[in-house]
Amino acid sequence: MKDFKLKDKSVKIKEMSVDDIDFCNDVPQMRYEGDQVVAITNLSKARTSWIRRGVEGADDKFIKSLSEDEKNELSLAVQEYQRLGE
């Protein structure tokens, strides 16, 4: 586990299982036209999945208390922490 500091909160980032990491990586969907990506969907769902599975105590109340910037920052921190072992 790793301590992570947001603006006015401290959280603990958990080590996730391979299944949870795969789930989070598979949430975003890309739509192609020919060889070009024209849309990426489910980005908010993916961000929430990373936070919910990768942060200790990340229930709805906690997630709703975060600003959009904090959600983005925390989601990226969770992903980076999971990649340390790769």
Predicted features along the sequence, with ranges:
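Short acidic-hydrophobic surface loop/beta-edge motif
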Residues: 1-9
